[in-house]
Structures are given as structure tokens and as C-alpha cells.
């Protein structure tokens, strides 16, 4: 079975592709695939960009506090779920608030390796094409709150599931919106 591949088409025409790993974080992948299929990410921005660390997006409000109206269980070691995907450059992971089960739609893509996130955030995929685009976004000028001065807009986000079925995610009570300080 082929893993799902997500294509991020940026407003400027740049393309990033990421392979998702359902064997590592099955419900997280179900959630991401579901949101992509609904067009949730289309038109959203990378609202938080830290060169040498990561780029974060997926907030419908573009502020760092928005989400899809629900949260999912955090699939990472500190939350009792085995997840051995380390936060190397290009890895996709879910942003969350302090509560381990507070991730919803916000995600981040690693610009550089960050071992302090391993086991504490739900890594679920990796950029397979377009790491140069991640680098370009990560190196864009930002304001005092790490917000890009020039909007980094995901024009269209699509997923190829190769005929595999990815069910709707299991959701939790809605915890506080993700606004992590270290991821």
C-alpha cells in the first residue's frame, strides 16, 4: 500500500509534496487527509515562521489560535503513543497547546532538526519534494511575533490516497487552541 502524498501549491506557484505516515500516527494522518479533502487548508497562510526551526500554518484565523472546532489525541510518546519519527528537517508535525490532546488543524514543517520536540509532538509525515520551498518560506522576513511580512499563502492543498480509504478522525473534547511556544 502506498502512503498518502499531500501537495501544497503556494500562491506564488511553488510546490511542496509530503508523504504521510499512517503507520506512525494513524489518527493524525486520518485528520490531515480529512481536512485536506474538505479544502480546509486552501487559502490559509503560514502564520508563524522561525528560520532554523520551523514554519507553522493551518489556522483558519491566521492568528495561531484557530482550528477546526475539535481536537485529536496527540500521537506521541509523552502521551502514551509510540511514535519514533524524529523532528528532522522536512518533517510534518501537529501544533498544539499545552494539553497533549489539543491539536486540531495547525501543523508545522521542520526547517532544521529539533530533537527537543521528539516524543512531545505528533510527527506524521515528511517533505519529499520542495524542501527548497520550505527553506524559502523559513527565511522570509518576519515581524516581532514571527509572522511573515509577506503572506505565505497555501493556494491549494490536495492529497493522493492511491485508492486507500482514510476514515474520519477520532476526535476529543475541544481543548484550548494551539499556540505552542516551542513548536
Placement of each model-derived feature along the sequence:
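Short proline/glycine-enriched turn/loop segments at secondary-structure junctions
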Residues: 141-150
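Active-site scaffold segments
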Residues: 54, 91-95, 104-137
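Internal glycine-rich, Lys/Arg-flanked active-site/core loops of soluble domains
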Residues: 16-101
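Short structural boundary motif marking the start of a folded domain
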Residues: 2-6
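Short acidic, Gly/Pro-enriched loop/turn segments at secondary-structure junctions
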Residues: 162-171
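Single conserved hydrophobic/aromatic residue that forms the stacking wall/gate
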Residues: 175-183
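Glycine-centered tight beta-turn/hairpin loop motif at sheet-sheet or coil-to-beta transitions
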Residues: 11-13
Amino acid at each position: 500500500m502506498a502512503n498518502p502524498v499531500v501537495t501544497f501549491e503556494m500562491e506564488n506557484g511553488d510546490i511542496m509534496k509530503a508523504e504521510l505516515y499512517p503507520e506512525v500516527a494513524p489518527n493524525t494522518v486520518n485528520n490531515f487527509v480529512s481536512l485536506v479533502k474538505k479544502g480546509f487548508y486552501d487559502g490559509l497562510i503560514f502564520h508563524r515562521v522561525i528560520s532554523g526551526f520551523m514554519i507553522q500554518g493551518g489556522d483558519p484565523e491566521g492568528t495561531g489560535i484557530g482550528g477546526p472546532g475539535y481536537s485529536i489525541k496527540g500521537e506521541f510518546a509523552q502521551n502514551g503513543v509510540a511514535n519514533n519519527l524524529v523532528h528532522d528537517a522536512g518533517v510534518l508535525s501537529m501544533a498544539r497547546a499545552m494539553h497533549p490532546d489539543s491539536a486540531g488543524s495547525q501543523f508545522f514543517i521542520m526547517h532544521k532538526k529539533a530533537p527537543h520536540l521528539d516524543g512531545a509532538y505528533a510527527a506524521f509525515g515528511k517533505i519529499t519534494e520542495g524542501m527548497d520551498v520550505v527553506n524559502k518560506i523559513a527565511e522570509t522576513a518576519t515581524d516581532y511575533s514571527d509572522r511573515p511580512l509577506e503572506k505565505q499563502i497555501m493556494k491549494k492543498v490536495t492529497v493522493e490516497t492511491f485508492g486507500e480509504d482514510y476514515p474520519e478522525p477520532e476526535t476529543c473534547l475541544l481543548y484550548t487552541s494551539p499556540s505552542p511556544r516551542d513548536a
